[in-house]
């Protein structure tokens, strides 16, 4: 490369396929070259006007490709005269919290739950996750690439971010609040596996470590693999635990199971967390369970497009203009706290980034407070059960074309799902195509923002019906696509 080569990020996106999804930049590892990651980091520095001699925190998940990407981002920061605070392997919310508390931007290297052959980069300003406006500015940025190495050795690890994160929970939850509980951790390749164990032991729990692996396993908390469904039930019989805790790869999405090894739906975990914390106002995507409104727990509920930036945007209007306690959560279980809270033990700082640890602690604490098992917590909620799954390797443009056709032609909906669900009442195109039927059944199709997948969410009066709706709807729409 010659000196001072200019690169347009928009053109780089098109040529590489590495682009912004629902949260952060995602793409194939083979396309995320040192040069590309260097360029994206310069665009981030340029968009946020990060001055030389500033500090930027970098952390990463446990994907094999993450250290190389982190090194390229560090090289770009060094070229721009910016100091890297390298936090090494750390949960995304821990990186975000540390950056926010220290008023510095942050970069998280993670592909979250997406397939093994992909990875990503999430960017944070000193105020939290960057907005869609920031993303648009980065997407049109023109950066000047120098004649330097696009990857340099990472600096020494700074452990402060981990301690900041642990202290957030220790300040709010009383010591020994989990005493007497047997809690299992499905460790797999979660970046939070050791941190969660340390936290639970410190709060008095007896901890059982299960399923640790050195190979990276992409866990999708909205489409839990059948092997993990069966594994949790087997472990429950063997180990007699009160709950089983896990997360996706970068620990911003919880995976919480009850004493029977039944994984709880993420939006139900979010609802129960908000109940425990005494939240007044909830922002949540259109795909989440309608039990949120039907429960009557909250003064206000706002529905958004899918993706944490949209949830954060909805939360911000309350945070700026209302004294209400504000939070948000998604169908994946990631919980965002918009208001600082206080308990008898101490304060819980706000964190407007998806978090997996808070919701798991809150739901377990709620069950202990009510002197019941986790499986009993949902029995007081309105009978609205949900399910979700996906068709992988399904091009996004195909998904969009099919959904546009269904939305434009009501007879197509009747042909596709009429004998399964009956007559439809209305459609919602806030994000994808959400079809509500007069029977009360809901089927929601949406292209994933992070990978070439078509997702399906369903809601019904019982779990078997919701599971059937998802399985049958995906089978039918796949056939519909090829006819």
Task: Describe each PLM feature range.
Residues 2-218:
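Gly/Ser-rich phosphate-binding catalytic loop and adjacent alpha/beta segment
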Residues 9, 162-373:
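Phosphate-binding chemistry for phosphorylated carbohydrates and sugar-nucleotides
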Residues 279-457, 463-483:
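Phosphate-binding and adjacent anionic-ligand microenvironments
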Residues 127, 260, 459-464:
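A generic structural motif
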Residues 30, 34, 42, 46-50, ...:
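Generic secondary-structure signature for well-ordered alpha-helical cores
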Residues 94-95, 231, 465:
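Short acidic active-site motifs
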Residues 122, 255, 434-436:
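Residue-level detector of beta-strand face positions
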């Amino acid at each position: 490369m010659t000196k001072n080569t200019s690169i347009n990020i928009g053109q780089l996106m098109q040529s590489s396929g590495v682009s912004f999804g629902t949260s952060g930049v995602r793409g194939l590892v083979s396309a995320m070259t040192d040069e590309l990651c260097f360029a994206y980091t310069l665009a981030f520095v340029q968009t946020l006007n990060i001055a030389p001699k500033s500090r930027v925190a970098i952390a990463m998940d446990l994907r094999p490709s993450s250290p190389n990407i982190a090194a390229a981002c560090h090289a770009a920061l060094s070229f721009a005269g910016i100091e890297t605070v390298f936090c090494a392997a750390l949960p995304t919310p821990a990186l975000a919290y540390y950056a926010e508390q220290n008023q510095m931007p942050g970069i998280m290297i993670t592909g979250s739950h997406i397939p093994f052959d992909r990875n990503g980069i999430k960017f944070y300003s000193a105020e939290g996750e960057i907005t869609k406006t920031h993303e648009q500015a980065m997407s049109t940025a023109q950066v000047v690439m120098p004649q330097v190495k696009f990857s340099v050795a990472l600096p020494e690890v700074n452990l402060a971010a981990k301690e900041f994160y642990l202290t957030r929970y220790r300040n709010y939850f009383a010591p020994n609040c989990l005493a007497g509980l047997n809690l299992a951790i499905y460790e797999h390749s979660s970046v939070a596996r050791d941190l969660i164990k340390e936290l639970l032991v410190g709060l008095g729990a007896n901890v059982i470590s299960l399923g640790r692996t050195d190979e990276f396993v992409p866990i999708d908390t909205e489409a839990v693999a059948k092997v993990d469904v069966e594994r949790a039930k087997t472990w429950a019989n063997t180990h007699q635990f009160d709950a089983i805790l896990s997360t996706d790869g970068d620990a911003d999405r919880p995976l919480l199971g009850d004493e029977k090894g039944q994984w709880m739906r993420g939006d139900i975990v979010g609802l129960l967390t908000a109940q425990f914390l005494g939240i007044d106002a909830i922002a949540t995507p259109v795909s989440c369970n309608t039990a949120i409104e039907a429960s009557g727990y909250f003064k206000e509920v706002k529905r958004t497009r899918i993706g944490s930036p949209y949830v954060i945007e909805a939360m911000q209007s309350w945070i700026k203009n209302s004294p209400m306690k504000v939070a948000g959560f998604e169908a994946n279980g990631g919980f965002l706290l918009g208001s600082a809270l206080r308990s008898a033990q101490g304060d819980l700082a706000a964190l407007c980034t998806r978090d997996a640890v808070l919701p798991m602690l809150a739901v377990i604490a709620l069950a202990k407070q009510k002197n019941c098992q986790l499986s009993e917590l949902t029995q007081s909620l309105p009978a609205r059960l949900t399910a979700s799954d996906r068709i992988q390797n399904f091009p996004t443009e195909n998904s969009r074309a099919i959904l546009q056709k269904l939305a434009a032609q009501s007879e197509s909906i009747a042909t596709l799902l009429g004998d399964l669900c009956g007559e439809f009442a209305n459609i919602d195109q806030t994000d994808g195509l959400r079809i509500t039927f007069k029977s009360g059944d809901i089927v929601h199709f949406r292209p994933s923002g992070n990978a070439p997948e078509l997702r399906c969410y369903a809601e019904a009066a019982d779990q078997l019906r919701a599971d059937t709706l998802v399985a049958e709807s995906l089978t039918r729409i796949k056939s519909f696509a090829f006819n």
